[in-house]
Amino acid sequence: MSSSLSLDFVFYVLHTCAIMSCAADSEHEFQVLEGICVGVSDGDSLHLELQSGERVRVRLYGIDAPEKNQECALAARKKLGKLIYNKQIRVEVLDIDKYGRYVGRVYAGARYVNRFMLKEGLAWHYRHYAADDELLAEAEARARAADRGIWASEAPCRPRNFRSEKRKEGES
């Protein structure tokens, strides 16, 4: 087993234990979705076909990948697709967003996909929604330090700022 995969497994086990302890100690219970990834919209969104045949949209919790027409957007979508497309995945649902998407922690086997995308430098840690998630913060910090992915750019633009600018351009 490669050291990266074994580290992912260790983080998966620790994360799972933390979630189980949280669920046991409070009213928090996580809905878990399992199925096959049948589509990847971008670097932080996917389509999941559940075992029942129902298809649902999923947003990766705590990350914000580049938008279409933004630097690294295609690389992020391709990397996510290579990792999960047409594969069995598990989603620990934390919320449902205003677009009706399930927002959650996505796992492909033992690999925590949200963290993986940050580690590869293909997304920002979305602190607005996941400020206390140290695993995600640490993964982004490592990618930044290594100038990986979006961090190789001289002036990376956060996707939420990119979206805001596009909306302003549309208003003009």
What are the language-model segments listed below?
Residues 1-2:
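N-terminal secretory signal peptides that target proteins for export/translocation
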Residues 5-172:
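Small beta-barrel nucleic-acid-binding modules, primarily SNase/OB-fold domains
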